[in-house]
Structures are given as structure tokens and as C-alpha cells.
């Protein structure tokens, strides 16, 4: 066989080295879109929750009684309330308009708010009422002893206060507050979405029950449950703020009302009574009374019987002040 006739196999194709292979380019556009979506999710959630929170539908279908009645002061228009009650939870559950009206003959309304709402919204509910209704003859302000320390400079963005601001003061200051507390705003948004979409009260029973209660009592809310058997924990000790208390009195005396500032009755079993009795003696229009623990359904909430007892004491003060005012007016007329 001739060497020239031998056929050689074709050479194998050269393999591409990794350096020669076409490089896989990252899908930058897809990645950017993904990041944008991730960034927009909380923005969309917060925006949606704000729209939900501002709707009447939300109040009717969540399960918190305090949120259910939070709009009560803002619904009153041209309402004659010769005695107007404002304050914290101790006033909301502990001052009964029907009892005061029966004892004094004066139409009475209670527009007190939970402590958590006051911490953020302050006197928004009271100021709104005074703008839309005839001014009262008597303005009764009642707070638990620790609340006389005045508003906290850096209050937590809680549900009750944030909801009230969002529904009734949706201006630049409110949205600045949300913007400067992003984590708390997200928590508030999550709460609104959770209570509106997951834990929803389909029949609106909570709203109907709470609303019927405050309409029939002109603002008194009685928390469910029996009276306490013993003190659950000591009430915290906080230094009262005389300047804040004085500013409340001065601000609302300009409305022509007789302003009466009360410290709520104290559980007899709580050892901090002496601390507040001494510090508030010259600042309030009453001395701290001590009530049996059975007249409280929670530390700052009263049973119906406790509210009645407290309201009768306030009615007596109003009657005395009313007679003094009438006598003073008679002398001026003479």
C-alpha cells in the first residue's frame, strides 16, 4: 500500500476556551424592575392602608371598640352640651352624662378619648367640637394622675392616635409625622390591613354595639368585664407638669366655659396615691379620691357603678359652681 493513498481523519474542531465563549450578560433591566417592585410594595401598602383607614367602611368592620367610637366627637354638629366632658380613658369610662344631666338638669356630653389617641392627637377632638358646636357652660377635664405630666415629646405612632390624625387632620404636619417615623408607619399600615382584610368583623357587630352604647349615654363607654379583685400593678409615678395644666385652663377659659380639672379616682390598693395626692393638691379642682378596686374594670377604666359614683361627685361640684356663678351674676346685675 502506498503511503500517499492513506486517508487521514479530519482534525477535530478546536474547542472554545472559556475566554472565547460568549459571555452571559446580566439582565440589568429585569433586575432593576425587580428592585423597583420591591421598593414600591411598602409604598403601595401604606397608601392603600391610608385610603382604607379614612373610609367609614373600615370603622364599621374592625373589632376594636375604641376605634369604632373614635369619630363620635367629630360627628356632633350644633349640639347643645352645657356640660362638656373631655380627658383620657378615665373620663371616657368614668363620667356618665346621663347621671350629671339628671343631677344638674344640664345637657351633658362626653367626648373623652383613649390615652393613646391623646398622646398623638392631643386636644384635636375637643377643639373640633368647640368649632362646630355652641360652647359649654362647664368644661370638665379629667385625667388619670400620671397623665398630668403632659404630652410626651416623642410619642409612639400608635393605632388610635394615628387613625384620628389621618381621618381628621390629614395635612402636611400629619404626613410629615408619618414620613419621619417610617418603621412605625409600616407597623400602622400592617395593622390597618390586618384588621380590615384578615381579622375583619364581617357583620359589624363591634361597631354597632359600641356606637349604640355611646349614643344612648352621650359618650360614656363602659368596658366589658366585671370589677377587678385586686390591684394588678402599681400605677407609674410621673412628675406633674404645672405649666401644662395651667395652659389647659387658660386656653379653654377663653371660650367662656367654667373649666374644672379633675384627677380621676384612684384604686385604694395602689400605694402611689400619696405621691400624687401631694403633688396635685394645688393643681386640680379636686383631691384624689380612693375607690374600692371593684369599681375598676381595668387600671384606668371604671365599671358602670364606678362611673356613677364619680359622676355624682362631679355633678355636686357643677351644682355648687353653678349656684356661685348665678349669685355672682345677680350681684353684678344689681
Segments predicted by a language model, with ranges:
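Glycine-rich phosphate-binding "P-loop"
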Residues: 48-62, 232-240
Amino acid at each position: 500500500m502506498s503511503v500517499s493513498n492513506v486517508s487521514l481523519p479530519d482534525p477535530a474542531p478546536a474547542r472554545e476556551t472559556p475566554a472565547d465563549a460568549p459571555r452571559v450578560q446580566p439582565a440589568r433591566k429585569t433586575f432593576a424592575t425587580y428592585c423597583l417592585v420591591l421598593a414600591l410594595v411598602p409604598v403601595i401598602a401604606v397608601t392603600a392602608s391610608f385610603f382604607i383607614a379614612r373610609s367609614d367602611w373600615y370603622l364599621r368592620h374592625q373589632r376594636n371598640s375604641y376605634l369604632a367610637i373614635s369619630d363620635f366627637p367629630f360627628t356632633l354638629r350644633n349640639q347643645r352640651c352645657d356640660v362638656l366632658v373631655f380627658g383620657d380613658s378615665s373620663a371616657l369610662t368614668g363620667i356618665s352624662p346621663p347621671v350629671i344631666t339628671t343631677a344638674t338638669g344640664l345637657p351633658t356630653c362626653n367626648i373623652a378619648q383613649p390615652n393613646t389617641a391623646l398622646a398623638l392627637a392631643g386636644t384635636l377632638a375637643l377643639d373640633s367640637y368647640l368649632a362646630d358646636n355652641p360652647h359649654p357652660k362647664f368644661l370638665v377635664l379629667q385625667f388619670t394622675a400620671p397623665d398630668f405630666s403632659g404630652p410626651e415629646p416623642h410619642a409612639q405612632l400608635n393605632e388610635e392616635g394615628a387613625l384620628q390624625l389621618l381621618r381628621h387632620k390629614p395635612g402636611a404636619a400629619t404626613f410629615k409625622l408619618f414620613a419621619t417615623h417610617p418603621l412605625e408607619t409600616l407597623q400602622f399600615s400592617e395593622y390597618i390591613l390586618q384588621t380590615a382584610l384578615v381579622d375583619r368583623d364581617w357583620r359589624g357587630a363591634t361597631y354597632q354595639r359600641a356606637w349604640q352604647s355611646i349614643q344612648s349615654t352621650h359618650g360614656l363607654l363602659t368596658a366589658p368585664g366585671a370589677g377587678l379583685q385586686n390591684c394588678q400593678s402599681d400605677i407609674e409615678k410621673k412628675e406633674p407638669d404645672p405649666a401644662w395644666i395651667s395652659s389647659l385652663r387658660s386656653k379653654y377659659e377663653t371660650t367662656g366655659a367654667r373649666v374644672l380639672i379633675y384627677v380621676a379616682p384612684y384604686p385604694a390598693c395602689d400605694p402611689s396615691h400619696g405621691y400624687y395626692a401631694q403633688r396635685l393638691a394645688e393643681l386640680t379642682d379636686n383631691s384624689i379620691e380612693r375607690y374600692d378596686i371593684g369599681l375598676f374594670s381595668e387600671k384606668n377604666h371604671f365599671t358602670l357603678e364606678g362611673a356613677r359614683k364619680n359622676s355624682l361627685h362631679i355633678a355636686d361640684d357643677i351644682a355648687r359652681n353653678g349656684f356661685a356663678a348665678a349669685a355672682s351674676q345677680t350681684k353684678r346685675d344689681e
